[in-house]
From Swiss-Prot:
Record-level GO BP terms: viral budding from plasma membrane
Reported function: Plays critical roles in virus replication, from virus entry and uncoating to assembly and budding of the virus particle. M1 binding to ribonucleocapsids (RNPs) in nucleus seems to inhibit viral transcription. Interaction of viral NEP with M1-RNP is thought to promote nuclear export of the complex, which is targeted to the virion assembly site at the apical plasma membrane in polarized epithelial cells. Interactions with NA and HA may bring M1, a non-raft-associated protein, into lipid rafts. Forms a continuous shell on the inner side of the lipid bilayer in virion, where it binds the RNP. Determines the virion's shape: spherical or filamentous. Clinical isolates of influenza are characterized by the presence of significant proportion of filamentous virions, whereas after multiple passage on eggs or cell culture, virions have only spherical morphology. Filamentous virions are thought to be important to infect neighboring cells, and spherical virions more suited to spread through aerosol between hosts organisms.
Database matches in InterPro entries: Flu_matrix_M1, Flu_matrix_M1_C, Flu_matrix_M1_N, Flu_matrix_M1_N_sub1, Flu_matrix_M1_N_sub2, INFV_M1
Record-linked HAMAP family: INFV_M1
Region (RNP-binding): 165-252
Gene transcribed to yield this protein: M
Annotated region described as Membrane-binding, given as residue ranges: 1-164
Membrane topology: Peripheral membrane protein
One cellular component (GO) term of this entry: virion membrane
One protein family per Pfam: Flu_M1
Oligomeric and partner information: Homodimer and homomultimer. Interacts with NEP. Binds ribonucleocapsid by both interacting with genomic RNA and NP protein. May interact with HA and NA. Cannot bind NP without genomic RNA.
Superkingdom per UniProt: Viruses
Protein's recorded name: Matrix protein 1
Amino acid sequence: MSLLTEVETYVLSIVPSGPLKAEIAQRLEDVFAGKNTDLEVLMEWLKTRPILSPLTKGILGFVFTLTVPSERGLQRRRFVQNALNGNGDPNNMDRAVKLYRKLKREITFHGAKEVALSYSTGALASCMGLIYNRMGTVTTEVAFGLVCATCEQIADSQHRSHRQMVTTTNPLIRHENRMVLASTTAKAMEQMAGSSEQAAEAMEVASQARQMVHAMRTIGTHPSSSAGLRDDLLENLQAYQKRMGVQMQRFK
């Protein structure tokens, strides 16, 4: 796996799924391919994106700044600085300085990542802030190691929280989660269907599923009534894709 592929993988792992994630993935690909070369326009776009947490925006802003060539005196962005200040905690700043000194001795991406993984997310963010504010310099490779370590920690905590939701025994939460997943799957089917003749069938299945979820929410139904809803939808989607000659078996 190339360095930039690895960075893209880690950064996207902390972005919530949805159309915005696809948009960010495209921007990252363009930036890494040297296509998107106006840093100011890119940062303005990032600043106004909804849904993303300030820290995620800060990390993305840091990655864009590392990758897109810019004029020497280009102003640093406040929204990135605020996100990478370790919540203003002096302990985070102290640890960030210690980490920075260790990173100065590293020359490889993996070496930097290993060193960084033993620090808290707050200290890692503060260390990124030091580098972003030009208070310290490291090689791009080392900076990317720091980024990936931070993303790994965030993704770990997101995974724990997601696992808690998936394994919850509360039937109401499970019921709602199944309906949300069915609804988003239906939306994806509608987007993928396009305008071919066979698309009408997929659109019909998706539309019925969304109507069913809407009705279930409106009248209130037994928590077990949503069981299998998303799986049925996915089977329909896969059958449709097979007829279209597309193989995407890994949706479930």
